[in-house]
Amino acid sequence: MTNGPLIVQSDKTLLLEVDHPDATACRMAIAPFAELERSPEHMHTYRLTPLGLWNARAAGHDAESVVDALLRFSRYPVPHSLLVDVAETMDRYGRLQLLNDPAHGLVLRGLDRAVLVEVAKSKKLAGMLGAQLDADTIAVHGSERGHLKQVLLKLGWPAEDLAGYVDGEAHPIALREDGWHLRSYQREAVEHFTAGGSGVVVLPCGAGKTLVGAAAMADVSATTLILVTNTVAGRQWRRELLARTTLTEDEIGEYSGERKEIRPVTIATYQVLTTRRNGTFPHLNVFDARDWGLIVYDEVHLLPAPMFRFTADLQARRRLGLTATLVREDGKEGDVFSLIGPKRYDAPWKDIESQGWIAPADCTEVRVTLPDRDRLAYAAAEPEEKYKFAATADAKLPVIKALIERHGDEQVLVIGAYLEQLHDIGRFLDEEGVPAPIVHGGTTTKERERLFDAFRAGELRALILSKVGNFSIDLPEAAVAVQVSGTFGSRQEEAQRLGRVLRPKGDGRQAHFYTVVSRDTIDTEYAAHRQRFLAEQGYAYTIVDADDVLTEPPAAG
């Protein structure tokens, strides 16, 4: 027995003692391959899953490094069966390979003949495989490349896709590094992606994922299709590309609800591509409009389910996924792995914070006590109405105002999910002399950009954001975020929202992230679920009582 911070159990759970002096080093060592499940104050629970281990394997970690991390930090002897299982699971990745044979086109090759025989017999692969070419090789129908990888993953034999890519139409793109240069982790991320050909780069919000995309485009130097969550995010990409690369206005097209331009670099929204009319998707021609050399998926964890179907047909194109988290609330992480590609690079948030590239943040949960009248109404509410009732309680209003006052001149974002609640907050703050305009889905793109520009210029002190606030909005000076309601217990949303205040501040200021929840309700339970992802990245939540916030004097402004 050693005095390590980790307890490794035979059911593949790992318990990490948070207060141990080596806890941070241990968390960083296990983060590439273990998934955080629960994160109460003193003991965090991680789990080893096949997908987590395969992602680690594809990102360059071998079984030896995983086993070494477990042995190095474990307090008690690690069950031998678990170590064997880790090695065998990781060894499954790449025992089957997809290759491009000069004579036969796409083929599935088995480095282990028995595995090839086993999967070839599976009924799930019916119609995907062609003739057996030799003892180790089976022909694959070219159109089934994506679907085959999905099925092989489900069978427990994830194939390594080495079949290569079409070069696409060449188009010169170069970075214009005048007065700035790629940070070391951005350059590393691009190198890992280029070596793998396709896959996902995981970086914190605010760490410059767009620049990783731009550098990958420069490396590939071919026509590029960039898929984004909404028009505002698309225009942000456009601004960055014009500022940081040799691309000109005429070379970048926008394919959104408002415009339908196809240019050498085209930025399209997920929404437009997944629009259905009479059961068909009329805008899918974008994928065939040019001979794309690279497809970039921004915020890949939010990729709508129909996009996976389209992506299955794009396996001959280089694909780069960018995200702050591989967590998907719909459990489709396996489809991201099979169809976009495995994780190629992952930088822990705290690492990048320690290098000064994102602002240090403290996270606080403020618990509000509902008045008796509301508690009775909550108790009597239907189960499906309970969260909305608790999340939108009026008791939160004075707390929001007090939090804004607590931070004097700092710029504040108030973020929520229910429009009615956000309008109530806006009216309340207005009456209290704190004007805070609302940006929501119905706000026109023009008005949205006007408000964001005013906020960036310091003319607005507070902004209220609906779900729009979760995606790719560049408001670097926001130092305080107050979250009042969300999508039930969504961890990915929590990560996005913290990312809004993590842009490094010019004077090295701390960022503050508050979640206001109703005590003794489902609101508190959901908050605990949402915090898991950030706990995994090393952020601790402090829990305070609303009365403490309401009774403290406001900061000097």
Feature map (PLM): residue ranges:
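Post-DEXD/H (motif II) to motif III coupling segment of the RecA-like Helicase ATP-binding lobe
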Residues: 293-294, 301-364, 534
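Conserved interdomain hinge at the start of the Helicase C-terminal
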Residues: 380-417, 423-428
